[in-house]
Amino acid sequence: MTFLPLKSPLKFYAVVPTADWVERMVEAGADTVQLRCKALHGDELKREIARCVAACQGSHTQLFINDHWREAIEAGAYGVHLGQEDMDTADLAAIAAAGLRLGLSTHSVAELDRALSVHPSYIASGAIFPTTTKQMPTAPQGLDKLREYVKQAGGTPVVAIGGIDLNNARAVLATGVSSLAAVRAVTKAANPEAVVKAFQALWDG
């Protein structure tokens, strides 16, 4: 099983909770956005995902849907992002057959090995620094471990996530990761659009 490669580098990767936020990120020119929506179910969730897909059409923003792979396939989303536990329950073959890209979360060498075995479009590694966004199963990985994960991943793009902000972004990029993901650095910012542009400028300088 192999998943399609990314059409373009992920670069700055905003993780947001609603379609409203996805629309804002597209308007701000974000390279990549993930809908991580835990509050909606059923038809409401389907409508939310459909809004996200519509918002990204005609833009360069790559859209990933967290967890909800069936709805993502139905809506024609660009990709799906799954956690380690989701690998046991999601129909990975169906996701691949539908032509969706796949990203997988990893928190250790063993999880990275497992993720790489299904040839995903990218892997996410974290949490790099302490984070209050979600309860993490492992201690923060730190930059030295992240550097090793990048080597282990070989040609598979690595997204760093967890406690990343504009103060530490350059140090994280220096490990060789191809993308920086941010949650609170965007959603809690006074001016999220300016934060997006500041992150994306890291790849231009």
Swiss-Prot record:
InterPro entries xref list: Aldolase_TIM (IPR013785), ThiamineP_synth_sf (IPR036206), ThiamineP_synth_TenI (IPR022998), TMP_synthase (IPR034291)
Binding-site list for 4-amino-2-methyl-5-(diphosphooxymethyl)pyrimidine: 34-38, 66, 105, 134
Its recorded reaction(s) are: 2-[(2R,5Z)-2-carboxy-4-methylthiazol-5(2H)-ylidene]ethyl phosphate + 4-amino-2-methyl-5-(diphosphooxymethyl)pyrimidine + 2 H(+) = thiamine phosphate + CO2 + diphosphate; 2-(2-carboxy-4-methylthiazol-5-yl)ethyl phosphate + 4-amino-2-methyl-5-(diphosphooxymethyl)pyrimidine + 2 H(+) = thiamine phosphate + CO2 + diphosphate; 4-methyl-5-(2-phosphooxyethyl)-thiazole + 4-amino-2-methyl-5-(diphosphooxymethyl)pyrimidine + H(+) = thiamine phosphate + diphosphate
One Pfam family assigned to this protein is TMP-TENI
Q: Which SUPFAM superfamilies match?
A: Thiamin phosphate synthase
Q: What class of enzyme is it?
A: transferase
Q: Is Plastid there in the keyword field?
A: no
UniProt-listed GO biological process terms? thiamine biosynthetic process; thiamine diphosphate biosynthetic process
Biochemical pathway: Cofactor biosynthesis; thiamine diphosphate biosynthesis; thiamine phosphate from 4-amino-2-methyl-5-diphosphomethylpyrimidine and 4-methyl-5-(2-phosphoethyl)-thiazole: step 1/1
- This protein's UniProt keywords: Magnesium, Metal-binding, Thiamine biosynthesis, Transferase
Q: Which GO terms describe its molecular function?
A: magnesium ion binding; thiamine-phosphate diphosphorylase activity
Record GO cellular component, one term: cytoplasm
Recorded family membership: Belongs to the thiamine-phosphate synthase family.
Q: What is the role of this chain?
A: Condenses 4-methyl-5-(beta-hydroxyethyl)thiazole monophosphate (THZ-P) and 2-methyl-4-amino-5-hydroxymethyl pyrimidine pyrophosphate (HMP-PP) to form thiamine monophosphate (TMP).
- Write the protein's name: Thiamine-phosphate synthase
Q: Which organism is it from?
A: Neisseria meningitidis serogroup A / serotype 4A (strain DSM 15465 / Z2491)
User: What gene is behind this protein?
Assistant: thiE
